[in-house]
A protein has these predicted regions:
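Active-site-proximal beta-alpha core segment in soluble small-molecule metabolic enzymes
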Residues: 1-130, 135-136
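Active-site anion/phosphate-binding pocket segments in diverse small-molecule metabolic enzymes
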Residues: 122-306
Length: 306
């Protein structure tokens, strides 16, 4: 199964020839229901109005569309807070929406409210699933217990047995968060699968502190600067519009430091770079999950597979 929150990415995956089932990770917008049915096989849902629209559109397109109902277990993003309402909604989907297939239940933990995917939290989801199963008289296909933040429960053997689907992104794409934040040994994973490459467009020695009256930057912030004297700097032809924050990109070249950025420029301190850096050079950077999300959604960034 391939999953994305963006229908555009799902369409791209299909155009690349991927024939695996497609899951829409973000609950659908009402305005995109026709595309949800056209492009995806499964979607996460929490609103009766959207479910009815999906059912109607699936019938129009001659399809059966699977849905996973989302439970909010405290992270306070999407999902039913009232669990009795969720059970009744599941029964309604099962009995009254002939073009939808009630595939399972799911939850999100950690992405907004920073709530840990504890065994107790995940067991709450299992209890909801079993309440639904008792009402509809069959076993649900999926109990989806979160995303990368739920992987530690697999590593420590405390994942409830009935949880059989995780919507994992960072944990397989980069595998850095589990190491950094949870202390898990991820040495078996390649953590350098993605490389950001950017071209140097200027190299000059300049003061390290702006000269003049400091006001606000292009994003309305009032940064602080450290005066380190005259330093050799390089500009890159890429900026915050492309990757988000300078805190999420890491130069591979020794002695190179990212010191700032605007929308379309990134400023490096190269005074102590291990090698000479010239205009036209291509510099490589490691990236974190946030910058990966920005970069892969930016149409200005060329993505090369090797």
């Amino acid at each position: 199964m391939i999953a994305s929150s963006r229908l555009e990415q799902i369409e791209d995956a299909k155009e690349y020839g991927i024939t695996l089932p497609m899951l829409l990770l973000r609950v659908p917008m009402l305005s995109e229901v026709p595309e949800v049915i056209r492009l995806t096989d499964i979607s996460l849902n929490s609103e009766i109005k959207v479910l009815r629209a999906l059912n109607e559109e699936a019938a129009k397109q001659g399809k059966h569309h699977k849905v996973i109902l989302m439970a909010d277990l405290g992270d306070l993003r999407e999902g039913y807070w009232d669990k009795e309402e969720m059970v009744e909604m599941a029964v309604q989907v099962e009995k009254e929406m002939g073009s939808l297939i009630l595939a399972g239940v799911g939850t999100n933990l950690g992405c907004y409210g920073s709530i840990e995917a504890t065994p107790d939290k995940l067991q709450e989801l299992v209890v909801i699933a079993e309440a639904i199963e008792a009402r509809i008289g069959r076993t649900l296909e999926f109990i989806s217990g979160g995303a990368t933040t739920s992987l530690p429960r697999i590593f420590d053997g405390k994942m409830p047995e009935r949880v059989n689907l995780l919507r994992v992104g960072e944990g397989i794409l980069l595998a850095k968060d589990l190491d950094r934040f949870y202390g898990l040994d991820m040495s078996s994973m390649h953590q350098d699968v993605y490389t950001l490459k950017a071209e140097v467009i200027e190299v000059k020695s300049k003061p390290s502190h702006p000269v003049g009256t400091i006001s606000i930057d292009a994003f309305g912030h009032r940064p602080t600067y450290v005066d380190r004297g005259i330093r050799k700097r390089a500009l890159l032809g890429i900026g915050k519009v492309d990757y988000g924050s300078i805190d999420e990109i890491f130069p591979r070249e020794k002695g190179v430091e990212v010191i700032g950025a605007s929308s379309d420029h990134t400023i490096l301190d190269i005074e102590e770079a291990a090698k000479d850096i010239e205009v036209g050079d291509i510099l490589s950077f490691d990236i974190d999950y946030a910058s990966l999300v920005y970069l892969t959604n930016c149409r200005n960034v060329q993505i090369v597979f090797k």
